[in-house]
């Protein structure tokens, strides 16, 4: 349990002099539909809806006070009389969204101060890196938890999440629950949306990891520079003790040179000549269908890891996780001893195989960069047969990457099947038109909107020496068509064919 708070404890010094007596607050809430009696309702203008339109609903549901984003740059206070008896304070607050993380932190006693907390950001790799960190530290005796795309919790009990980075309130609440349950270490995915919307601003990070940046979410950020600057906030504005940077990414290379207390990580011999800080560099990697041998050198010493994870991208992910744990004080010897026990993440380069059938790889790749890297890796393994690629692009999301992904798939695959991948309320045919619009040679291209039929057709038709990549959904257990969520699992479909 934690000590309940009064309103003035949460809003000083931004707001002072409010003399309305209200009960101790029982919780904080951004959604008026979830209000319980005694809650503080925080009403902000969101991306899809405006919470200020639901203040009366929140009061009717039991809210005892309201913090609201102001409609102009001023801050002011009014009293709302309910049933001629109750006085509900409504405080209009300029730039309220920037303060919610701190308000929630105060309410939940800033739980991140009681944890070893690592934040991971980048276009690709966040989920794998956070799960590696959680898995690795669990093997070393920590009670570790993860927060991100696959959900929140200890690895044996992950609760699904609706987004990569939770709201500012939910983030602090979950961290408090972790502390109360004895968790000592947390690895958190931090999305560009989460950074842009100030959801993690009042957390205290031991390490921030940067994996890479490539085209994604430009429907939200408008351009790649705004996307980069959202990511940069984690390294430039928030409370972070140490940094781990992938310097093989040109953005990471530039950022490293302006950071202190950083570890430079490279798998391409790309350390800056002027770099005098800590570092990890790949010496050699041997790639196999069911694992990778990683040989590296570092400012902590040299070593090798026999990993169960596949591909060049996971070599980088493993070394980034290694750098974070080393800079936190975990010993290289213990990390090397446990490194071979790290297991792959569901839906991330997940191999499914069966005698007399093609080798199938299921992955979440949904950006041009991720698509290209997995195709190159699979092409390296597929030296006897043909490479099939099944993928689509999400509806009502960044359109700019669709044609790029079509060209990449067509270039690196022997056969390409374009199918549905969460079309949402967008016309699937228009999504497919965007994907194929810049493909010049379409002889090896086939369009099958029905994803289940596409997978069945390809896996049944492909030869035993072939490789089939099923990309875009990864761990997901649904297909979002229109307003409906239909049960769907790429893995389950493949396994049913293998039976």
Curated annotation (Swiss-Prot):
Subcellular location: Cytoplasm
Major localization listed first in the record, in broad terms: cytoplasm
Stored SUPFAM superfamilies: MurD-like peptide ligases, catalytic domain, MurD-like peptide ligases, peptide-binding domain, MurE/MurF N-terminal domain
List of residues binding meso-2,6-diaminopimelate: 397, 421-424, 472, 476
Intervals of motif Meso-diaminopimelate recognition motif: 421-424
Cofactor (UniProt): Mg(2+)
Similarity field: Belongs to the MurCDEF family. MurE subfamily.
Protein name: UDP-N-acetylmuramoyl-L-alanyl-D-glutamate--2,6-diaminopimelate ligase
Source organism (scientific name): Blochmanniella floridana
Lineage, top ranks: Bacteria, Pseudomonadati, Pseudomonadota, Gammaproteobacteria, Enterobacterales
């Amino acid at each position: 349990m934690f000590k309940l708070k009064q309103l003035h404890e949460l809003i000083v010094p931004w707001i002072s002099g409010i003399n309305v007596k209200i009960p101790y607050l029982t919780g904080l809430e951004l959604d008026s539909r979830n209000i319980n009696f005694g809650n503080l309702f925080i009403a902000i203008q969101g991306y899809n809806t405006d919470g200020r339109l639901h203040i009366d609903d929140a009061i009717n549901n039991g809210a005892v006070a309201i913090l609201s984003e102001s409609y102009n740059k001023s801050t002011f206070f009014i009293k709302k009389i309910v049933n001629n008896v109750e006085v509900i304070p409504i405080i209009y607050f300029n730039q309220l969204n920037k303060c919610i993380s701190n308000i929630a932190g105060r309410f939940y006693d800033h739980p991140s101060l009681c944890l070893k907390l690592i934040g991971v950001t980048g276009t690709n790799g966040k989920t794998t890196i956070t799960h590696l960190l959680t898995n690795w530290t669990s093997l070393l005796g920590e009670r570790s938890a993860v927060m991100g795309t696959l959900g929140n919790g200890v690895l044996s009990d992950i609760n699904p999440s609706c987004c990569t980075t939770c709201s500012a309130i939910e983030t602090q609440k979950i961290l408090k629950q972790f502390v109360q349950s004895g968790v000592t270490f947390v690895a958190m995915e931090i999305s560009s949306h989460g950074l842009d919307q100030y959801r993690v601003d009042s957390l205290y990070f031991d390490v921030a990891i940067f994996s890479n940046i490539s085209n994604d979410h430009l429907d939200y950020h408008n351009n790649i520079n705004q996307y980069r600057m959202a990511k940069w906030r984690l390294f430039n504005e928030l409370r972070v003790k140490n940094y781990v940077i992938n310097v093989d990414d040109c953005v990471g290379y530039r950022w490293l040179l302006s950071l202190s207390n950083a570890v430079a990580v490279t798998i391409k011999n790309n350390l800056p000549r002027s770099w005098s800080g800590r570092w990890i560099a790949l010496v050699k990697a041997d790639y196999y269908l069911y694992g990778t041998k990683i040989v590296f050198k570092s400012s902590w010493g040299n070593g090798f890891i026999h990993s169960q994870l596949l591909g060049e991208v996971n070599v980088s992910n493993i070394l980034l996780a290694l750098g974070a744990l080393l800079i936190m004080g975990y010993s290289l010897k213990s990390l090397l001893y446990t490194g071979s026990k790290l297991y792959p993440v569901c839906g991330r380069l997940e191999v499914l195989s069966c005698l007399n059938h093609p080798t199938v790889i299921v992955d979440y790749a949904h950006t041009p960069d991720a698509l290209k890297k997995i195709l190159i890796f699979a092409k390296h393994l597929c030296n006897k047969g043909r490479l099939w690629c099944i993928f689509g692009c999400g509806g009502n999301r960044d359109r700019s990457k669709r044609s790029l992904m079509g060209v990449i798939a067509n270039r690196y695959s022997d056969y390409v099947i374009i199918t549905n991948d969460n079309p949402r309320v967008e016309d699937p045919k228009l999504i497919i038109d965007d994907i194929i619009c810049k493909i010049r040679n379409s002889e090896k291209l086939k369009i099958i909107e029905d994803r289940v039929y596409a997978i069945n057709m390809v896996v049944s038709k492909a030869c035993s020496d072939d490789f089939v990549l099923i990309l875009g959904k990864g761990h997901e257990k649904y297909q979002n068509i229109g307003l409906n969520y239909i049960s769907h699992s790429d893995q389950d479909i493949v396994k049913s064919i293998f039976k």
